[in-house]
Amino acid sequence: IVLFAATLVNEKYPAVTPASELFRTALKADNGEEATTKTNLLKQAKLIKCSGETNEKEVARYAVDGDVKTKWCDTSTAPNYIDFDFGKEQTIRGWKLVNAGNEGSVFITHTCFLQGRNSPDEEWKTIDELSDNKKNTVVRQFKPTSVRYVRLLVTQSTQNNSLKAARIYELEVY
């Protein structure tokens, strides 16, 4: 379905909203709080590093491309991670993770951490921890915190610890 909208104005130079500000996602937190609309800050962030990529069809940038049909896959030794730079400090309050449950429930990320820091010289600090996860799509909220850099750190990539493949279809940070 494609929707188009137009507005007629009498102004010579009407205000324009960048397309990037129009990308928003409606969320309902796992704790049942009311749905809110958030902007995915990773859409504007620079991907600066990852632990690995399985092949050219499963690269790290696919974890934040907004397409749940593409994914980042890393079969290197755990922990697996993907790092982003917002370019400046941002206040974040939550995140969304879409796992590979569509490939089988065994591929749902079991344990991971959202981490942050404000300088490349600082140690990563855990902002939120997801453990013993069984959900394919997870939405989490936490106390607002300001960071410049954010990392998804996957320590147990699957439900069966003998399988070693981090498979992330989408990662969003708000």
Predicted ranges, named:
Residues I1-L27, T37-I48:
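Extended hydrophobic/Leu-rich segments
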Residues L27-D65:
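Predominantly extracellular/luminal regions of secreted and cell-surface proteins
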Residues F4, N10-L22, E58-T126, D132-Y174:
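Aromatic, loop-rich ligand-recognition surfaces of beta-strand-rich domains
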